[in-house]
Design a protein with these regions (language model features):
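Non-catalytic nucleic-acid-binding/docking modules located in mid-to-C-terminal regions
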Residues: 38-52, 67-74, 80, 107-110, ...
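Noncatalytic, basic helical substrate-engagement surface that gates or grips nucleic-acid strands
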Residues: 1-138, 146-164, 256, 261-275
Length: 316
C-alpha cells in the first residue's frame, strides 16, 4: 500500500478541531491515525509506504512552468474557534505533519520525503520498482493524477470518493484508458495545479472525439493532431486543439509520471531504503508520543496487528 501521505493528512487537519489538554490542535494527527488504521483494516497490506511531498514542492516542474500551482490558497479549516492567528495555524499544521512522521518512524512503515520533489514522482518510482513487479499495489490518494499509473498490478483507492479504480473501470467511467489518461488531462488542463487546458474542452469531449484513447495502446500528441487534421473533422474542438498544441505538450511534460522527476541520487536512496529494510516497531515510544499529544484514546488495533504481521513475515 503506497499512500499519498499529505493528501490524506490534510483531510483530518482541515475538518477535525480537536485540541489536546494544552490547547494545541491535534486533529491532523488524530484523523491521520484513524484513516491509516481503517486503510490497513480494509486493504491488509504486506508492506506500508507513506510518501510525503518534499519541502519546496517540485523544483523541476516550476522550472518548466513558473505558474505551476501558483495562486493556491492555504487550506481552509473549520476550526477557527481555536483562537489562533494565521501564522500560528500554519506553524501548528507543520508541527502536526512532522509529528505524524515521527510516530511512524517508530513503526515498520517506510516513509519518503525527498526535498524539492512531489510525492507523485516518488510514488511512481516506487510503483515501478522491479522489486515489486509481482506485487499487487494499492495507491491511496484522492488525486486523479495517479490514474495514469494503473495497470494489471496497480489500483487506486480514493477514500474521499469511496472508490477503487482499476484499468478496466477507469475506461468505463471516463472513456479513457489509464495509459492515455495523462494525455487526455493535458488537453483538458488541471485548474488545481494552475494548468489551463484547451478552452471549452472537457474529458467527455476528449473521450467522444478521440475514442481510440480508450484502447490500452499508448497514444501521443501527434496521434491527436493527426486526428484533428482529418478533412472530415471540422468541428471547433479539433481546430482549438491544433491551435493549442504547444500548451498540451507543456501540460503533458508536467503531468506525466511515466518518467518521474527524480535525480539519480534520489532514486538510489529509495532503492537502498527497500534493499536495507528491516521492519521494527517501538510500541513504547509510540505510546509515549501519543500520551504527550493527547491522542492515546485513538484506536490503533488494526495498525498494530498489521505491524506485527509485517515484522513476522520479514523475519521468516
Amino acid at each position: 500500500m503506497i499512500v499519498d501521505a499529505y493528501n490524506q493528512f490534510i483531510r483530518g487537519y482541515i475538518v477535525d478541531p480537536s485540541k489536546n489538554p494544552n490547547g494545541s490542535p491535534i486533529g491532523g494527527i488524530r484523523t491521520f491515525i484513524n484513516i491509516f488504521n481503517k486503510l490497513t483494516r480494509e486493504i491488509k497490506p504486506d508492506l506500508l509506504v507513506l510518501v510525503w511531498d518534499g519541502k519546496g514542492g517540485s523544483k523541476k516542474r516550476r522550472s518548466m512552468n513558473k505558474s505551476y500551482k501558483g495562486g493556491r490558497k492555504p487550506p481552509r479549516t473549520n476550526w477557527s474557534q481555536v483562537g489562533m492567528v494565521e501564522e500560528e495555524i500554519t506553524d501548528n499544521k507543520v508541527w502536526q505533519q512532522m509529528r505524524v512522521i515521527e510516530y511512524f518512524n517508530q513503526t515498520p512503515v517506510i516513509q519518503f520525503m525527498e526535498p524539492l520533489v512531489e510525492a507523485d514522482d516518488v510514488i511512481s518510482y516506487v510503483k515501478n520498482n522491479p522489486m515489486f513487479a509481482e506485487w499487487q499495489k494499492v495507491i491511496v490518494s484522492a488525486d486523479k493524477d495517479f490514474i495514469q499509473l494503473l495497470d494489471d498490478k496497480t489500483i487506486l483507492h480514493r477514500p474521499i470518493q469511496k472508490e477503487y479504480l482499476n484499468k478496466n473501470n477507469v475506461v468505463e467511467k471516463f472513456g479513457i484508458h489509464p495509459s492515455n489518461f495523462a494525455l487526455a488531462r493535458a488537453i483538458v488542463g488541471d485548474s488545481s495545479d494552475n494548468l489551463p487546458g484547451v478552452p471549452r474542452v472537457g474529458m467527455e469531449t476528449v473521450a467522444k472525439r478521440f475514442s481510440f484513447l480508450k484502447e490500452e495502446q499508448t497514444y501521443y500528441l501527434e496521434h491527436i493532431i493527426a486526428e484533428c487534421e482529418k478533412p472530415e473533422n471540422k468541428q471547433k474542438v479539433f481546430s482549438s486543439i491544433k491551435e493549442n498544441k504547444e500548451l498540451i505538450k507543456n501540460n503533458y511534460d508536467i503531468m506525466q509520471l511515466s518518467s518521474p522527476m527524480l535525480s539519480i541520487q534520489a532514486k538510489q536512496g529509495i532503492d537502498n531504503t527497500f534493499e536495507e529494510y528491516q521492519p521494527h516497531y517501538n510500541q513504547t515510544e509510540v505510546r509515549k508520543l501519543m500520551l504527550q499529544d493527547g491522542v492515546l484514546t485513538v484506536t490503533t488495533t488494526d495498525l498494530e496487528q498489521r505491524f506485527n504481521n509485517i515484522i513476522t513475515s520479514f523475519s521468516q
